[in-house]
Amino acid sequence: MRLWHEALIPQLPRPQLLGQHRECCALRGNGWGRKHATVDYVFTHSPYRLYAYHRLIMEEMAGRGYNVSPEWLDKNYRGKTCPPYQDLAEEKLNSPIYSEHDTAYYEECLANLREKGIELE
């Protein structure tokens, strides 16, 4: 489980893009705060950032013609079995959304994709 560097989102192959959507759904729901080495940094920020990152994924999916369940477009939605946020505070965000998504992380993501046989620029 990892969040791909947001600059890679438009280039992600279908399986990685759809997998990222599933991972974002899990993290936004009952997975919030559960330890996992590659995504622990996400929990040091507001859940709003994960929502904003997930929006990027969903926008890319929609642009490729995939259907996105509209519930996930609601910042407060956390899945069918997890209570929603009452009113998740919005934040002014920079790009990248996560400061951890720096040049070194970008290169790490590219290397991870290469290990899977996927070559991106």
Predicted regions mapped to residue ranges:
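Expand to "…catalyze enediolate/carbanion chemistry for C-C bond making/breaking, isomerization
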Residues: M1-E121
